[in-house]
Amino acid sequence: MSKHVAVLMGGLSAEREVSLRSGAACAKALEAEGFRVTTLDVDRDIAQKLAALRPDAALNALHGRYGEDGVIQGVLEMLAIPYTHSGVLASALAMQKDRAKDVLRAAGVPVAEGVTIGRFEAAKAHVMTPPYVVKPLGEGSSFGVIIVRADQTHPPQELTRDDWAYGDLVLVERFVAGRELTCAVIGDKAYGVTEIRAADGGWYDYDAKYKAGGSIHILPANLKEFVYQNVQELALVAHRALGCRGVSRTDFRYDDTPQGTGELVVLEVNSQPGMTETSLVPEIAAYAGISFGELVRWMVEDASCDR
């Protein structure tokens, strides 16, 4: 009898639409691999649904709050349902950008200087000399991220809006010029390094990430060999330092601009990276000869409650 897999998707976070796409792609691939699949759009009665369903494993295709921060992982452990990706602690750490940076810094991973501050304080005066970046502490997919440019005289007033939905604390972080790089870790091995560019030459924001034709992926990234290897090594160190399991993706900035310093810093570790067939991790896996079906099969076979 084929293994029964519950694909958890949708959810209650700002990244709901991205998660629905990840979940649908994973469910389709698992069915093609011979698994019996039930898709669950996660809401506040998910524990009851899972208890009634009793799947053999759960593939976590959730992104953002409640799905990527240790909450759903705790529910699955309480119900003794093996699940994919990282466990409770690693998920919570990776989702909280300031806490993750503390752990990475202690492990010797280079990160950009930053400070955690209330959003209203960050809107009163420049916290640091521009350019800098303002990020919500616990969101992904670039939701709520603000770039404060070098010529910007006033701090970002978007932070004071009544409809701000990303929490009252923000991370203000020094802007690092140069290229955006990313590296996937699958199991305990770092795979290919991709350079990501917004198709319009601008910032790699939500539209660039998820709209058709919004970004250009260069795989393998055109880097000197020692830089390429350094990215892979740091991705693996970051994955291990946070205690990640299964699949993760670490994002970097590399300053090789004409006046640059050659600085390479980790921006964040994604413990629940996008999982559509054209997302970065499946693309990197395919470059290594791992099909999307093989990837999701491995993820389910790797699922456990000891993460």
Curated annotation (Swiss-Prot):
Annotated ATP binding sites: 128-182
UniProt EC number: 6.3.2.4
GO terms of biological process kind: cell wall organization; peptidoglycan biosynthetic process; regulation of cell shape
MF-aspect GO terms: ATP binding; D-alanine-D-alanine ligase activity; metal ion binding
Enzyme class: ligase
Cofactor: Mg(2+); Mn(2+)
Pathway: Cell wall biogenesis; peptidoglycan biosynthesis
Keyword ATP-binding annotated: yes
Residues engaged in binding Mg(2+) 1: 251, 268
InterPro entries named among the record's database cross-references: ATP-grasp, ATP_grasp_subdomain_1, D-Ala_lig_Van_CS, D_ala_D_ala, Dala_Dala_lig_C, Dala_Dala_lig_N, PreATP-grasp_dom_sf
Primary location class: cytoplasm
Protein location: Cytoplasm
Binding positions for Mg(2+) 2 per the UniProt entry: 268, 270
Domain (ATP-grasp): residue spans on this chain: 101-301
The protein's name in its UniProt record: D-alanine--D-alanine ligase
Keywords (A to Z) from UniProt: ATP-binding, Cell shape, Cell wall biogenesis/degradation, Cytoplasm, Ligase, Magnesium, Manganese, Metal-binding, Nucleotide-binding, Peptidoglycan synthesis
Reactions mediated catalytically: 2 D-alanine + ATP = D-alanyl-D-alanine + ADP + phosphate + H(+)
Cofactor note: Binds 2 magnesium or manganese ions per subunit.
Protein role: Cell wall formation.
GO cellular component labels: cytoplasm
Disulfide bonds: none
Family stated for the protein in its record: Belongs to the D-alanine--D-alanine ligase family.
